[in-house]
């Protein structure tokens, strides 16, 4: 796995590596798996929790940009350890347009290297690191952002997609 920390202004494009296999429940109904997305580009943006200020901002920004992702032929999915019940309330409250995947056991989050120790007010706990992955139509991760700062992030993902798909 190519794990890197992406800071503002750095190149998120990585040496391609295989997206881990997954099969997760989707807020849109049914399950979404790596196999079901074969032949399609997709973006997975991982965030710590529904209904928290920064995660809400990030989800709303990705949702507003969904038509731009669709115009590029790219599927967009939010991913957190929240269950489908939490996702349904979150989607309804903010009018989110993209599906959210529920990784309650953090299997994919961990496989992507985005589950780890965090600290809040001196208290240590395990949680999801905000990160984003661009997966191509062959199932390879072509770009990744780690420890994401939300300001300007959606635009950076779209810019990278334009470059990769050119």
Predicted features along the sequence, with ranges:
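Chalcogenol-based redox active-site neighborhoods
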Residues: 1-166
């Amino acid at each position: 796995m190519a794990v890197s920390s992406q800071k503002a202004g750095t190149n998120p494009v990585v040496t391609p590596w295989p997206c881990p296999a997954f099969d997760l429940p989707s807020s849109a109904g049914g399950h979404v798996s790596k196999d079901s997305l074969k032949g399609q580009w997709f973006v997975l943006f991982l965030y710590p929790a529904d209904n928290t200020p920064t995660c809400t901002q990030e989800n709303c920004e990705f949702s507003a940009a969904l038509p731009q992702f669709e115009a590029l032929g790219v599927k967009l999915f939010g991913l957190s350890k929240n269950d489908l019940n939490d996702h349904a309330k979150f989607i309804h409250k903010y009018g989110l347009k993209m599906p959210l995947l529920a990784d309650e056991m953090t299997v994919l989050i961990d496989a992507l290297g985005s589950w780890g120790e965090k600290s809040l007010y001196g208290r240590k706990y395990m949680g999801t690191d905000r990160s984003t992955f661009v997966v191509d139509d062959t199932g390879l991760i072509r770009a990744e952002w780690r420890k994401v700062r939300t300001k300007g992030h959606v635009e950076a993902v779209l810019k990278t997609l334009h470059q990769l798909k050119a």
